UniProtKB/Swiss-Prot annotation:
<dbReference type="InterPro" id="IPR036852">
    <property type="entry name" value="Peptidase_S8/S53_dom_sf"/>
</dbReference>
<feature type="glycosylation site" description="N-linked (GlcNAc...) asparagine">
    <location>
        <position position="233"/>
    </location>
</feature>
<feature type="glycosylation site" description="N-linked (GlcNAc...) asparagine">
    <location>
        <position position="202"/>
    </location>
</feature>
<dbReference type="InterPro" id="IPR010259">
    <property type="entry name" value="S8pro/Inhibitor_I9"/>
</dbReference>
<dbReference type="InterPro" id="IPR034197">
    <property type="entry name" value="Peptidases_S8_3"/>
</dbReference>
<feature type="domain" description="PA">
    <location>
        <begin position="386"/>
        <end position="460"/>
    </location>
</feature>
<feature type="glycosylation site" description="N-linked (GlcNAc...) asparagine">
    <location>
        <position position="395"/>
    </location>
</feature>
<feature type="glycosylation site" description="N-linked (GlcNAc...) asparagine">
    <location>
        <position position="175"/>
    </location>
</feature>
<feature type="signal peptide">
    <location>
        <begin position="1"/>
        <end position="25"/>
    </location>
</feature>
<dbReference type="Pfam" id="PF00082">
    <property type="entry name" value="Peptidase_S8"/>
</dbReference>
<feature type="active site" description="Charge relay system">
    <location>
        <position position="218"/>
    </location>
</feature>
<keyword id="KW-0964">Secreted</keyword>
<dbReference type="InterPro" id="IPR000209">
    <property type="entry name" value="Peptidase_S8/S53_dom"/>
</dbReference>
<keyword id="KW-0732">Signal</keyword>
<dbReference type="Pfam" id="PF17766">
    <property type="entry name" value="fn3_6"/>
</dbReference>
<keyword id="KW-0720">Serine protease</keyword>
<keyword id="KW-0645">Protease</keyword>
Amino acid sequence: MSKTILFLALFLSIVLNVQISFVVAESKVYVVYLGEKEHDNPESVTESHHQMLWSLLGSKEAVLDSIVYSYRHGFSGFAAKLTESQAQQISELPEVVQVIPNTLYEMTTTRTWDYLGVSPGNSDSLLQKANMGYNVIVGVIDSGVWPESEMFNDKGFGPIPSRWKGGCESGELFNASIHCNRKLIGAKYFVDGLVAEFGVVNRTQNPEYLSPRDFAGHGTHVASTIGGSFLPNVSYVGLGRGTARGGAPGVHIAVYKACWSGYCSGADVLKAMDEAIHDGVDILSLSLGPSVPLFPETEHTSVGAFHAVAKGIPVVIAAGNAGPTAQTISNVAPWVLTVAATTQDRSFPTAITLGNNITILGQAIYGGPELGFVGLTYPESPLSGDCEKLSANPNSTMEGKVVLCFAASTPSNAAIAAVINAGGLGLIMAKNPTHSLTPTRKFPWVSIDFELGTDILFYIRSTRSPIVKIQASKTLFGQSVSTKVATFSSRGPNSVSPAILKPDIAAPGVNILAAISPNSSINDGGFAMMSGTSMATPVVSGVVVLLKSLHPDWSPSAIKSAIVTTAWRTDPSGEPIFADGSSRKLADPFDYGGGLINPEKAVKPGLIYDMTTDDYVMYMCSVDYSDISISRVLGKITVCPNPKPSVLDLNLPSITIPNLRGEVTLTRTVTNVGPVNSVYKVVIDPPTGINVAVTPAELVFDYTTTKRSFTVRVSTTHKVNTGYYFGSLTWTDNMHNVAIPVSVRTQILQRYYDEN
């Protein structure tokens, strides 16, 4: 799992070239989840955890050796080193909701905010109306922070909010009294879960700081994207020059380091969430996720997020980087806001001029001098032009020349290294779009598609002495560059809860320019361009900060609804949004959820699909949680209704029907947050072959009526099993268009897998 700055799909973003080397411990770490706290006193909560372990292990010494963390603020539970049989024994205790094995999570700019319309240019802009996020606190759970970055300076900041109960922890090369300020108001680190599971990290192989300081830069990049201060004249290898800032430059940032050398222990992440809830964050941002989709009740971040959301804290989290394959989406709990990644209207065209005077525009992040004209070669037998064979079969014909190769799969750094080691001067790589550009000032590496690669190959074979010139990359932005869902972005449908649409929303996550640790191999003056849903997540978190500033009384689900129902389904220029992959197609809700985030529209959505904890309880009932389990989660006696509710009635800003056979009726409720006296009419764009009827077709709101419910009757005309078809349901008052995606699959034969 060792990759570097190609930003490949294995990580949510690639930030360092490491291989974890741990000493394997005998016992494993398990999280014993007990639900809502029974005591307000944290010490009493911890004592109850010790007593439970004592009943199993038999001595105080064994308890102290076993316990890793006590979760005692946002919820109750503990992490402990247990054998498999001990974990089974403790899971059978009546007060235990779930015993969850420890999981390793992977860590998944100047132009971004202007592209989305979040500009400080006028007094009526979202940024100005929200006072740039001032007095809001965002918690970032990631790999730490590089506090010296100017993006975290506190010039112009007032006092830290009085409600803040957190603080800063000193550690290796991190002095709390020096490195924290009125902007960076919190910094803590959590590593005990990782160490308890795998032993002490080998810091010779995996350099790290035992403190909140960020070694690799992932967390620094994320935090500065959310709320970095204004910093003029920033560029990256001379490209993308402009004023760098986060989405909410006035926000207070609290950093919780739970990720080490690219990996995050679930026990550590859960402890970070517990502390953040206690400290008083208003929003949580997590650019991380499991390598495979997990059920919410066995997934650490989902457990922590449930309690955060129940306390009014929105949780924004990455969709994952396992795309473009279907059903790869992770972080699928209905109470979190799951973010996919798109490109933005910026690219870096790089001119390739052949000896026949034909110029091809590839893509690169190359800030070096012009190269050429020099020789151009295509490695024939035994390489057959395959990029992946270059390193295994060094070829002397590459010396002093630019090499053309074709990549059948996601390319690796080995191809670039092979050309450099053979004395090559540059590399032109024909491949499927992966948004994996290596920044460089010395060695030009240019990406093109297979069609353009074939054109170059024809030229090479048409002349005895092919030559080529490669110019430095340029920055191009505006309507001539279309928006696409990134190839790496994980896709729906949701394999864990198919009736819950995931992702929820998309945001720019390709070549995002933000602050970085100087240790990073891609650092250029304290900044770097990175790609991944890790980078898209803080873009959405920044918007959530601004919405929270303007609407402090809105619930997490209200904020999610406002974002989803106002999203662009075309890009800001009005052009269609495509989804990159092995073949390019028009994007659909499984690629981008409600669409591309539209911050200015989200401020005034008109109507919202709101939810409370009671709605999530109905979800738990619908997916067969027991009354006892739900009661433990909530800390109060709860009985599911009989008959059990339908998951289709969960008041989400989307409708997803995975197994339609005949007809189904579902319900939604909307709350008016726009003009008091409003009349909305429904507009239906049904999926192909699907009939959709809404009753009533008109919703009237006034001073006494702020909520209205409606039913949606859905039936199919298909006579065979189909794939998903997509449409939309929109309420409009001619000023607001409140749109939700509709996704329907007909299943005449139930639970049938068709390989044809």
